[in-house]
């Protein structure tokens, strides 16, 4: 399924097994950087406020969230740099998915995608 927001086409994965739709962060990121949206997503994931939000979401909805690994990453000294794949694998996260290949990309639960969209641009979220 495709939705349009602020003139940008955004893919939505309909996920019957998870009972939630996942919205393409890659497509949203193209609004800011059409050539390399992965950089935009990585920059967002490299913010402490972002990973705190994601951890709160995962704590609410994911009984298998790796809180110990989250605290390890959160308390590491130096600059925080995480890719979507690293976040998913290290935290056992379910709120974000990442798929390689032609029809791949990074997708997130609507709660997370809207948070990302508001980081891109407040108007984009609205």
Placement of each model-derived feature along the sequence:
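An anion-engaging/catalytic patch
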Residues: 1-126
